[in-house]
Amino acid sequence: MDSSTVGAPGSSLHGVTGREPAFAFSTEVGGEDAAAASKFDLPVDSEHKAKTIRLLSFANPHMRTFHLSWISFFSCFVSTFAAAPLVPIIRDNLNLTKADIGNAGVASVSGSIFSRLAMGAICDMLGPRYGCAFLIMLAAPTVFCMSLIDSAAGYIAVRFLIGFSLATFVSCQYWMSTMFNSKIIGLVNGLAAGWGNMGGGATQLIMPLVYDVIRKCGATPFTAWRLAYFVPGTLHVVMGVLVLTLGQDLPDGNLRSLQKKGDVNRDSFSRVLWYAVTNYRTWIFVLLYGYSMGVELTTDNVIAEYFYDRFDLDLRVAGIIAASFGMANIVARPTGGLLSDLGARYFGMRARLWNIWILQTAGGAFCLLLGRASTLPTSVVCMVLFSFCAQAACGAIFGVIPFVSRRSLGIISGMTGAGGNFGAGLTQLLFFTSSRYSTGTGLEYMGIMIMACTLPVVLVHFPQWGSMFLPPNAGAEEEHYYGSEWSEQEKSKGLHGASLKFAENSRSERGRRNVINAAAAAATPPNNSPEHA
């Protein structure tokens, strides 16, 4: 058996024996793979995932998928939070109480708890293109229906239904994980999700601007806010059509076509679900994301009204300040992903985990300070720092998610995303729905919960890479970790081939420092003397 064969003696030492470049093994292609790789505009690895990202390119399939993914997610964020900057007008029109506004905020993020769970399964079984396109277009009628409501119950119900569209986050992250190499996945996931989340800030600017334009055309305030909803509704329709016609599930084609050709195996949903829910790391990341992305969604719902009421600001000024919270995503979330990738390059997976803890704990501290701030400048500074750290933590979390499981990636992404929405709904219900707490006090308590709920990250341990405080298990290898998700019968049929390829490409998570140390240890001769000396 040749030592280059996966599973052969010495195969786990590739990159540390001195015979192979330590970081080349995960991305080199040759022979038939090299011929197949030549059809792509970007350099690719053995799975045909892009090894670089070129933001100004629309090359098919990698960069076209990237842009379709983040723009579709962006449009869903715009529509879901379009009501937030217009609440002072809507509440007067519909006679909404504080409880009604709080319940609507909970509803807007609760709907996607279910849709994100479903989207994870859809991505695994049908592919992200169908999931993304159909959800966006199915949500479009509910966005248009916002212009027809005339009661608090209708307002809450429609915001609940629009919130289902936030499940495009799952298809976005899944899509990026199938298109880009593991060495840059933190940055790519951060860019796609961060630019999509930016819609929560952009809508704070877009909707008041559209409202003002319609008002200047002669419409009454109570008519203008309704007509403004035609902008996000139209955006849904356009993006749904573009994703369906221009998108592609995998680097080599669409999932259904590849399955018919026999290039991709059809998986069992029950087994995919089983390996997702029985992996304890999944549940820790559900909690972590609940108090990173979750608090971001909660803040999107309350921040404009908070500044409007507490500091007696003009609606437009409050909207601009609130917009800066969501707009920070353009740099914050990608920065979190980039820090995750850079740390992993030298220290491996352990650096990714430390990155999550540092960023999310800092975000909780700044959230607490935001609630205690008594002046406008101090509040704005604390809000910006809280925003940056919380959103960077989101990027850092999805720098790790692709490594939790290869087989159940879609469902784990969906569960983690749903955790974000569950955390948002729970936090809004606890601190921002009743009159028991002021919004400032609610922000203080939310900051404390963020810091407390970040602590379980210390329990995340990968046998082959270790955890925050513990080294990797002796003899643990990537092939065994990802291969353990397949039964011996499935392995005999070769169904685990994609997992083995991913395992090979994920060896970079050992970190350059660990690889150097392993190579040094392998090169050191035994420190003993012959018995006859």
UniProtKB/Swiss-Prot annotation:
The keyword Cell cycle does not apply. GO terms for molecular function: nitrate transmembrane transporter activity. Pfam families: MFS_1. It is found in: Cell membrane. Signal peptide: none annotated. GO terms for biological process: cellular response to nitrate; nitrate assimilation; nitrate transmembrane transport. It comes from the Eukaryota. Disulfide bonds: none annotated. GO terms for cellular component: plasma membrane. Induction: Circadian-regulation with a peak in the middle of the morning. Induced by nitrate and sucrose in roots. Down-regulated by ammonium, glutamine, asparagine and aspartate in roots. The chain crosses the membrane at residues 70-90, 101-122, 133-153, 160-180, 190-210, 227-247, 283-303, 319-339, 351-371, 384-404, 411-431, 442-462. It is a multi-pass membrane protein. Keywords: Cell membrane, Membrane, Nitrate assimilation, Transmembrane, Transmembrane helix. Plants over-expressing NRT2.1 have accelerated growth under low nitrate conditions. Heterotetramer composed of two NRT2.1 and two NAR2.1. Interacts with NAR2.1. Involved in nitrate transport, but does not seem to be able to mediate transport by its own. Acts as a dual component transporter with NAR2.1. Imports nitrate with high affinity when expressed with NAR2.1 in a heterologous system (Xenopus oocytes). Belongs to the major facilitator superfamily. Nitrate/nitrite porter (TC 2.A.1.8) family. This is High-affinity nitrate transporter 2.1.
